[in-house]
Amino acid sequence: MRQSANLVRKHIVVTGLVQGVGFRYFTVTQARRLGVQGWVRNCRDGSVELEAQGSSDAVQALVEQLAIGPRWSEVSHVAVHDMPIIDETARAFGVRQ
């Protein structure tokens, strides 16, 4: 995980054209590259939901990448909310069903 003074956990919902375009796998790739832990999944309403925990810098960088998205996506909004930090020692970022 990138070094930072602050460990944060965020609940994030991304809306727009974000399903069927590789958005979850893009998210996993970016999160792992940044050393962020958590999960991502598709929602029935067409959005993508995730929880991300890591240094404040790494999570902010992930949010910035989510706002861009993979090539075929069209992100209309990224909602970010604070969550309590949990112990996820050694858990890799992954896809949930």
UniProtKB/Swiss-Prot annotation:
InterPro entries: Acylphosphatase (IPR020456), Acylphosphatase-like_dom (IPR001792), Acylphosphatase-like_dom_sf (IPR036046), Acylphosphatase_CS (IPR017968). Keywords: Hydrolase. The active site is at R24, N42. Pfam families: Acylphosphatase. It catalyses: an acyl phosphate + H2O = a carboxylate + phosphate + H(+). GO terms for molecular function: acylphosphatase activity. It comes from the Bacteria. Residues 9-97 form the Acylphosphatase-like domain. Its EC number is 3.6.1.7. Belongs to the acylphosphatase family. This is Acylphosphatase. It comes from Bifidobacterium longum (strain NCC 2705). The gene is acyP.
